[in-house]
Swiss-Prot record:
Gene this protein is translated from: Padi4
Citrulline: residues carrying this PTM: 212, 218, 372, 374, 383
Name listed for the protein in its UniProt record: Protein-arginine deiminase type-4
Annotated Ca(2+) 1 binding sites: 153, 155, 165, 176, 179
Reaction(s) the record says it catalyses: L-arginyl-[protein] + H2O = L-citrullyl-[protein] + NH4(+)
Coiled coil: none
Record: residues binding Ca(2+) 2: 155, 179
Organism: Mus musculus
GO biological process, one term: stem cell population maintenance
EC number: 3.5.3.15
Residues engaged in binding Ca(2+) 5: 351, 369-370
Length: 666
């Protein structure tokens, strides 16, 4: 909230003061009253509004002037109607009265100035002049909320640059400028005003490394933008001419919200009195604009696809052809990372997660680069980040990482309402251990802190450490649905698979085999149903999935009708530490690629009944009534045998939400 310095009156000599248009400036009448005086009267020139907060006047004189008692509850404020054309051109006279003394007068000379710091606090995409008396220092959420928004300038307009745009202190061109939030300082003063007064723009020292402010000088060339605030520079003295003047600034974020940074950055303009060189500068007026750094937002499977990413490796040519056909149907771009750039690391989903950031004036896709740093480690930096495509990461020591820090373990739900609480951008889903032990694995706390700090997609922690790889995309997915809910949650289900196989066995199909057409030992339905060890292992897996089912129903507000069980069997295998973890027994169909109504599902190689794979037919029977098209893709030798499937080997850039994140209430 804008604040002016208290004006103290002095009966023995005139007082000179500055009042800013639109701000009520306190006038200390009682503290300066001579001893023995009990009431006062006040008059002002036409350009000054006087407001006395008190009970009714004690006495009204024949001239119409009022008198007020000098009580402790007394409050007097002054407001000027307009900026002064010359110094001291407005006057206020205070008259003190006592029962046994002659009246004493104090004279205050007022200089009115216009001074406002304006930003897009109404979130329209344009800077409007600051409204007098409107608080710009408080940032509020919701459809009626106010407060400016700031983007982290994390793209790279110059492809030849070594880093992101915010990593230097230059503005490259107008495109770079569009990633920043404009701010304007407007002043109107007497011509000689700044001979005795100084304006200073500042940011709290604790936040100067989170923001950079450029001042625009004449012209529009990049060299005409000078750094005013930023790392190592928390204040900036403005040298301004008197009269009416406008100064433009451009503000860029340097850091995303995180555990140690809530995302709020106040920028403050201070007016200082430097008229007496023998005294320190005195604070006359102060106003602030608070920016919030836009959060990084994930996009769920229900958002329309725009681009699919995949790796070319030595033996996945047929997989790539199938994927090309699918992306063509879905009308989205296919980007293939060549072998020499991925170094046999085909796990595109694990390497990165593509989301976006948004301000009223700009939306920017941003890739979140996982800390796993394997063969694909350079792909997000060299092939994804670029002009109008941002980048963020959290660097961690390799010794601190587990498989749960890869981004197959990072998903997001569609929008949900939970016990009356709306999550219009969905909720982030991450996998952790169900309980702590010396062998348990969790997503690194630094990653969890970053995701939680974004505020708009409150994370839900699931139990995934029971899996060999340990990722949530191994047992869940979401698909769009043409109904009020708008989606279905898909969960892998050993129970559903056993029920299907038992039904087929009862129909006389017990000798039908899995893995037909593969160089792999075939197993009949009868053999699978009679394998007690496999049944026991899948009973354990089912208990783990059921635990997550309950969490998802509670935290996403789902009913059983919102969930589809996808038949799937698992087997247990020892990991590097000798602990038993679950792997997919046949290609894991829930680990699918969702491109609108087109689904790329791992081909399960289930038993063939009447010329059709019974597992494929079962999945079609659940998904095609929703208007979805199922394409089963053979990923057996290129992905499945390495503990991954179609989703693990691909990544998708999706269309941002139409819902504006600042309209929600976290």
């Amino acid at each position: 909230m804008a604040q002016g310095a208290v004006i103290h009156v002095a009966p023995e000599q005139p007082t000179h003061a500055v009042c800013v248009v639109g701000t009520a400036t306190p006038l200390d009448v009682r503290g300066s009253a001579p001893k023995g005086y009990t009431t006062f009267g006040i008059t002002a020139s036409p350009g000054v509004i006087v407001d006395v907060i008190h009970g009714p006047p004690v006495k009204k004189s024949t001239m119409g002037a009022s008198k007020w008692p000098l009580d402790p509850e007394l409050e007097v404020t002054l407001q000027v109607k307009a900026a002064s054309s010359r110094t001291d051109d407005e006057k206020v006279r205070v008259s003190y009265y006592g029962p046994k003394t002659s009246p004493v007068q104090a004279l205050i000379y007022i200089t009115g100035v216009e001074l406002s710091l304006s930003a897009d606090v109404t979130r329209t995409g344009r800077v409007k002049p600051a409204q007098a008396g409107k608080d710009q220092s408080t940032w509020t959420w919701g459809p009626g909320g106010r407060g400016a928004i700031l983007l982290v300038n994390c793209d790279k307009e110059d492809p030849q640059a070594s880093g992101m745009d915010f990593e230097d202190d230059k503005i490259l061109d107008n495109k770079d400028l569009q990633d920043m939030s404009p701010m304007t300082l407007s002043t109107k003063t007497p011509k000689d005003f700044f001979e005795k007064y100084q304006l200073v723009l500042e940011v709290p020292k604790a936040k100067m490394n989170r923001v950079r402010v450029f001042r625009a000088t004449r012209g529009k060339l990049p060299s005409r933008y000078k750094v005013a605030l930023g790392p190592q520079q928390f204040s900036y003295c403005l040298e301004l001419p008197g009269g009416q003047h406008s100064t433009d600034f451009y503000v860029e974020g340097l850091a995303f919200p995180d555990a140690d940074f809530k995302g709020l950055i106040p920028l403050t303009i201070s007016l200082l009195d430097k008229s007496n060189p023998e005294l320190p500068e005195a604070l006359v007026f102060q106003d602030s604009v608070t920016f919030r750094v836009a959060p990084w937002i994930m996009t769920p499977n229900t958002q329309p696809p725009q681009e699919v990413y995949v790796c070319r490796v030595s033996d996945n040519e047929d997989f790539l052809k199938s994927l090309a056909t699918l992306t063509k149907k879905a009308k989205c771009k296919l980007t293939v990372c060549p072998e020499e750039e991925n170094i046999d690391d085909q796990w595109m989903q694990d390497e990165m997660e593509i989301g976006y950031i948004q301000a009223p004036h700009k939306t920017l896709p941003v890739v979140f680069d996982s800390p796993r740093d394997r063969g694909l480690k350079d792909f997000p930096v060299k092939r994804v980040m670029g002009p109008n495509f941002g980048y963020v990461t959290r660097k961690l020591y390799m010794s601190e990482l587990t498989g749960l820090d890869a981004f197959g373990n990072l998903e997001v739900s569609p929008p949900v309402t939970v016990r009356g609480k709306e999550y219009p951008l969905g909720r982030i889903l991450i996998g952790n251990s169900g309980y702590s032990s010396s062998e348990s694995r969790d997503m690194h706390q630094a990653l969890q802190d970053f995701l939680s700090a974004q505020q708009v997609q409150a994370p839900v922690r699931l139990f995934s450490d029971w899996l060999f790889v340990g990722h949530v995309d191994e047992f869940l997915s979401f698909v769009p649905a043409r109904d009020k809910q708008g989606f279905r949650l898909l969960l892998s289900s050993p129970r559903a698979c056993y029920q299907l196989f038992q039904e087929l066995q009862s129909q006389g199909h017990g000798e039908a085999t899995l893995f037909e057409g593969l160089k792999r030992k075939r197993q009949t339905i009868n053999e699978i149903l009679s394998n007690k060890k496999l049944r026991d292992q899948n009973a354990y897996v089912e208990s783990c999935i059921d635990w997550n089912r309950a969490v998802l129903k509670r935290e996403l507000g789902l009913a059983e009708g919102d969930i589809i069980d996808i038949p799937q069997l698992f087997k247990l295998a020892g990991n590097s530490r000798g602990n038993s973890k679950a792997q997919a027994f046949f290609p894991n169909m829930v680990n699918m690629l969702v491109l609108g109504k087109y689904l790329g599902i791992p081909k399960p190689f289930g038993p063939i009944i009447d010329g059709h794979c019974c597992l494929e037919e079962e999945v079609r029977s659940h998904l095609e009534p929703l208007g979805l098209h199922c394409t089963f893709i053979n990923d057996f030798y290129t992905y499945h045998v390495y503990n991954g499937e179609v989703h693990c080997g691909t990544n998708v850039r999706r269309k941002p939400f139409t819902f504006k994140w600042w309209h929600m209430v976290p």
